[in-house]
């Protein structure tokens, strides 16, 4: 998910590619077609995953490029809303959108986006990366709880069904777990 190019040095550029099918909140509600497809994710998650992958590699996320493929049925106001959402999310993460592409094609059934994130390596990350491969006995650090993303995703997608078996506060809380996605504070 994350790559460092050339030799390791402080301030080195690191890239991360994160792709996903984007859920559009629009009148055509194209997302309903693939509601059960777990690769379908909101724009927020694409950017957050990119930022998290960069942070996990020891880089500070600074910029991103966004490529969006749209079906012919998507209207310009929906594209503007999608880009506005992307700009807002990037700003929250202190990431500058520095470019990208938008393509419309009859071959596309629902919006697809790929974000390429760029980060700058810190001196500590350079030292760690220069040390070489991960070795037996090294620790794996988990900053959140296992199943966080899946719980939030499934609760949001299946809210109606879950409400028939569980109290509303429990389902709503699980669906809101996306607020914990960022690992940027822990990676700092």
Where are the regions a protein language model picked out?
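Helix-biased detector of long, well-ordered alpha-helical tracts
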Residues: 1-188
């Amino acid at each position: 998910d994350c790559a460092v190019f050339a030799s390791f040095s402080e301030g080195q550029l690191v890239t991360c590619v994160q792709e996903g099918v984007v859920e559009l909140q629009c009148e055509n509600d194209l997302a309903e077609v693939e509601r059960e497809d777990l690769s379908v994710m909101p724009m927020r998650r694409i950017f957050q995953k990119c930022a998290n992958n960069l942070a996990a590699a020891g880089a500070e996320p600074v910029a991103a490029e966004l490529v969006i493929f749209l079906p012919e049925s998507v209207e310009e106001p929906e594209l503007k809303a999608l880009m506005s959402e992307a700009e807002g999310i990037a700003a929250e993460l202190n990431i500058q959108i520095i470019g990208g592409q938008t393509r419309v094609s009859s071959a596309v059934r629902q919006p697809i986006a790929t974000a390429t994130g760029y980060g700058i390596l810190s001196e500590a990350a350079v030292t760690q990366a220069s040390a070489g491969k991960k070795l037996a006995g090294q620790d794996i650090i988990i900053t959140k709880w296992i199943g966080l993303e899946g719980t939030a995703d499934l609760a949001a997608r299946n809210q109606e069904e879950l409400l028939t078996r569980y109290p509303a506060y429990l389902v709503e809380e699980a669906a809101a777990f996306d607020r914990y996605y960022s690992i940027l504070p822990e990676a700092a």
